[in-house]
């Protein structure tokens, strides 16, 4: 089926452990990149996400799981980890996105730690497309 890269592809990559042939999988991801798709690693920091992804998968975006953001203000180890990941991502040309931002304090800390982008309820709850367009795109019209 034809899918335009601008429309996204959803969750192509869920769990490295579910992939039987890593080489074939990596080649498939490279082919998607040739067609203009961006490859994202979602929920990094939980489940099967590991640092080995940086050496085995050529991806564009690393999305930090909200569990790392939730305790950011009180947890120095979480701040050190995110700051270190920001450096690694920057050096590798990977965009770092923090999920689950709910407070201005979290936002300020993530800016200081050099996180590229943030998302979360601080800005908006998930919206149906029509509601999003009505709320955010009217100013562009």
Please annotate each region the language model reported:
Residues 1-13:
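Single conserved hydrophobic/aromatic residue that forms the stacking wall/gate
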Residues 14-23, 35-141:
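EAL-family c-di-GMP phosphodiesterase catalytic domain
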Residues 28:
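Conserved functional hotspot residues or short segments at active or partner-binding sites
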């Amino acid at each position: 089926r034809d899918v335009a890269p601008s429309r996204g592809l959803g969750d192509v990559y869920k769990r490295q452990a579910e992939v039987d042939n890593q080489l074939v999988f990596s080649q498939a991801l490279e082919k998607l990149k040739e067609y203009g798709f961006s490859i994202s690693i979602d929920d990094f920091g939980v489940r099967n996400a590991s640092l080995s992804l940086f050496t085995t998968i050529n991806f564009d975006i690393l999305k930090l799981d909200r569990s790392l953001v939730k305790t950011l203000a009180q947890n120095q180890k979480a701040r050190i980890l995110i700051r270190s990941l920001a450096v690694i991502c920057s050096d590798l040309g990977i965009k770092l996105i923090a999920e689950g931002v709910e407070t201005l304090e979290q936002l300020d800390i993530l800016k200081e730690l050099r996180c590229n982008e943030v998302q979360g309820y601080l800005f908006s709850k998930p919206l149906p497309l029509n509601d999003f367009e009505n709320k955010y795109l009217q100013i562009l019209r």
